[in-house]
């Protein structure tokens, strides 16, 4: 569907560039560089080498046989992005954007982060490339993801707790955009999700598409046919757009994004943007956002720090509006139960974000035939979430 995007960075009615004039020139410079280097054979060779020999690609497509048997119905295959270096899909995009920044002569990387995985990936590649790194993270998220805060600091990054607004991911993005506006001459903003002004959604789509390019070939090699469904969690939407990208033109493949319903889609404590959101402009893009009656961005909630974003990337808004993909809400209880299930049945402790996708697979698989297949992306590993899940279950873990 990327070919349907206009030069202005539009996905149907969504996307675009809604930024201060001070950033417009830098965005245009970034777009020109991206369009040049995406066609540059040497750049692609360098990126592929880093993905394969540093980030540990290709990631496995693993047949979850015991889970498939227990649920009955479809055969379930996990795309194991949790096995990448740094433990999540985030490094795919960071390598691409940071390599581009290096080619542009930038000396410093900045990023926002929610669960901390994008911050860790950015700090990791900044260390690899010998660049400065500053990461902005909501104060609430620094508290619930303290391990990742220390990992970023260990990697040489400065972590800036954001104490404005709700002190979560949207506020971290605000702070990062403000910092980029202040200092864009030597600084590259590494956008972590498929959000923001053009060309960020297009760049994230391209650099994360390696997930589905690999998965498509792997499922053909293992089963001889395309999957019947691809399932991935959605906050801003980077791992989901990467999981969907190579299947967009395969109309027989159902694409399903799983949003964080929090305490319930119909409650105020939710982050189910596509189901509950309205069209608006925020963070430099036109997309769907959770808003209050006055049209202001509403507070959101999820047990997952990586999914509690009040909007969604413009390509996801377009895919939902066009009917090419469907989006469902998964509440905290369902996600935690799925987190525990695959740990016990498959020996995999996945990120709580990914567990939202697993929870929907639990519902979907039994409705399908045994000769049908589902690919479910495990976007990250769950080390960072174990303490929070224990607390959720009332279990005390001693220091």
Curated annotation (Swiss-Prot):
The keyword Lyase applies. Pathway: Amino-acid biosynthesis; L-tryptophan biosynthesis; L-tryptophan from chorismate: step 5/5. It is an enzyme of class 4 (lyase). CDD domains: Trp-synth_B. InterPro entries: Trp_synth_b_CS, Trp_synth_beta, Trp_synth_beta/beta-like, TrpB-like_PALP, TrpB-like_PALP_sf. Its cofactor is pyridoxal 5'-phosphate. GO terms for cellular component: cytoplasm. The modification N6-(pyridoxal phosphate)lysine is found at residue 90. Its EC number is 4.2.1.20. It catalyses: (1S,2R)-1-C-(indol-3-yl)glycerol 3-phosphate + L-serine = D-glyceraldehyde 3-phosphate + L-tryptophan + H2O. Keywords: Amino-acid biosynthesis, Aromatic amino acid biosynthesis, Lyase, Pyridoxal phosphate, Tryptophan biosynthesis. GO terms for molecular function: tryptophan synthase activity. The keyword Phosphoprotein does not apply. PANTHER family: TRYPTOPHAN SYNTHASE, TRYPTOPHAN SYNTHASE-RELATED. The beta subunit is responsible for the synthesis of L-tryptophan from indole and L-serine. Tetramer of two alpha and two beta chains. Belongs to the TrpB family. This is Tryptophan synthase beta chain. It comes from Lactiplantibacillus plantarum (strain ATCC BAA-793 / NCIMB 8826 / WCFS1).
């Amino acid at each position: 569907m990327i070919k349907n995007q206009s030069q202005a960075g539009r996905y149907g009615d969504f996307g675009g560039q809604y930024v201060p004039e001070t950033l417009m020139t830098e965005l245009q410079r970034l777009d020109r560089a991206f369009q040049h280097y995406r066609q540059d054979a040497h750049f692609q060779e360098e990126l592929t080498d880093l993905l394969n020999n540093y980030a540990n690609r290709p990631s496995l497509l693993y047949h979850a046989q015991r889970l498939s048997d227990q649920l009955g119905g479809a055969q379930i295959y996990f795309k194991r992005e949790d096995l990448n270096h740094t433990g999540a899909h985030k490094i795919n995009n960071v390598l691409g954007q940071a390599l581009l920044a290096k080619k542009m002569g930038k000396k410093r990387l900045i990023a926002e982060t929610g669960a901390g995985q994008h911050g860790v990936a950015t700090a990791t590649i900044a260390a690899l490339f010998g660049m400065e790194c500053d990461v902005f993270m909501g104060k609430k998220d620094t508290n619930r993801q303290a391990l990742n805060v220390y990992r970023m600091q260990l990697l040489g990054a400065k972590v800036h707790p954001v104490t404005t607004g709700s002190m979560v991911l949207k506020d971290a993005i605000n702070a990062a955009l403000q910092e980029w506006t202040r200092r864009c001459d030597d600084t590259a903003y590494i956008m972590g999700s498929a959000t923001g002004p053009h060309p960020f959604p297009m760049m994230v789509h391209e650099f994360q598409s390696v997930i589905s390019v690999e998965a498509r070939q792997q499922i053909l090699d293992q089963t001889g046919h395309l999957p019947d469904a691809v399932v991935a969690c959605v906050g801003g939407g980077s791992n989901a757009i990467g999981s969907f990208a190579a299947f967009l033109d395969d109309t027989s493949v159902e694409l399903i994004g799983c949003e964080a319903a929090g305490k319930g889609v119909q409650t105020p404590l939710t982050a189910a943007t596509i189901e509950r959101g309205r069209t608006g402009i925020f963070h430099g893009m036109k997309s769907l956002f959770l808003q209050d009656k006055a049209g202001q961005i509403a507070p959101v909630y999820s047990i997952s720090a990586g999914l509690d974003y009040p909007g969604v990337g413009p390509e996801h808004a377009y895919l939902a509006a066009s009917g090419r993909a469907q989006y469902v809400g998964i509440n905290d209880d369902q996600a935690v139960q799925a987190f525990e299930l695959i740990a016990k049945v498959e020996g995999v402790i996945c990120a709580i974000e990914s567990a939202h996708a697993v929870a929907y697979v639990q519902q979907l698989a039994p409705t399908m035939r045994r000769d049908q297949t589902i690919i479910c992306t495990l976007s990250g590993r769950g080390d960072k979430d174990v303490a929070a899940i224990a607390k959720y279950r009332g279990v005390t873990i001693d220091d």
